[in-house]
From Swiss-Prot:
Component of the cytochrome c oxidase (complex IV, CIV), a multisubunit enzyme composed of 14 subunits. The complex is composed of a catalytic core of 3 subunits MT-CO1, MT-CO2 and MT-CO3, encoded in the mitochondrial DNA, and 11 supernumerary subunits COX4I, COX5A, COX5B, COX6A, COX6B, COX6C, COX7A, COX7B, COX7C, COX8 and NDUFA4, which are encoded in the nuclear genome. The gene is MT-CO2. GO terms for molecular function: copper ion binding; cytochrome-c oxidase activity. This is Cytochrome c oxidase subunit 2. It comes from Vulpes macrotis (Kit fox). Mg(2+) binds at residue 198.
């Protein structure tokens, strides 16, 4: 869950988000080292009286500043590709949920059940109860079992939307006429909030997403009551 004046990313709830946090730290360290080196060189140039105005050729330096950036790019690309393949891999999902974006709400259909579907609208500010979050609460939460692989099929009925839940490391575009898919697995129970992350019209800011991750026994009870 995000909080005011937060500087870092949200706490990881899924294995994918944990990998993304590690990759963020890895890349940030490389950027910090490069920035420190550049700042050191600039400071050295401004403070030293040594100049090389007569230097016409420096093949050793050219070789270093060609090979070193290539190595740095490889160090960034390899873990990035690994995470991309992890995000694209879908193996035997335990549950499939179809998500459709609309202007301006989400609809959900549990395809493994015969008649389990609902729309999810944002709760207006004037109807919020004490402790509920402004612009993030919905009338129907998406209840899912924790510690199980869930496949999300995502599309749109009208314009471009984007289904995103930061703490799970999820962001998938909802495109009219196209069905995108992603997987999620939460390692602990709780409420996880997201929002539409593609500008989709005047009420784009009023399309929250709320996932309620629960133990399997609770999910089975909930699904039986909903059907």
């Amino acid at each position: 869950m995000a909080y005011p004046f937060q500087l870092g990313l949200q706490d990881a709830t899924s294995p994918i988000m944990e990998e993304l946090l590690h990759f963020h730290d890895h890349t940030l360290m490389i950027v910090f080292l490069i920035s420190s080196l550049v700042l050191y060189i600039i400071t050295l140039m401004l403070t030293t009286k040594l100049t090389h105005t007569s230097t016409m050729d420096a093949q050793e330096v050219e070789t270093v500043w060609t090979i070193l950036p290539a190595i740095i790019l490889i160090l960034i690309a390899l873990p990035s590709l690994r995470i991309l393949y992890m995000m694209d891999e879908i193996n035997n999902p335990s549950l499939t949920v179809k998500t459709m974006g609309h202007q301006w709400y989400w609809s959900y259909e549990y395809t493994d059940y015969e008649d389990l579907n609902f729309d999810s609208y944002m709760i207006p500010t004037q109807e919020l109860k004490p402790g509920e979050l402004r612009l993030l609460e919905v009338d129907n939460r998406v209840v899912l079992p924790m510690e199980m692989t869930v496949r999300m099929l995502i599309s749109s009925e009208d314009v471009l939307h984007s289904w995103a839940v930061p703490s799970l490391g999820l962001k998938t575009d909802a495109i009219p006429g196209r069905l995108n898919q992603t997987t999620l697995m939460a390692m602990r129970p709780g409420l996880y909030y997201g929002q539409c992350s593609e500008i989709c019209g005047s009420n784009h800011s009023f399309m929250p997403i709320v996932l309620e991750m629960v133990p399997l026994s609770y999910f089975e009870t909930w699904s039986a009551l909903m059907v």
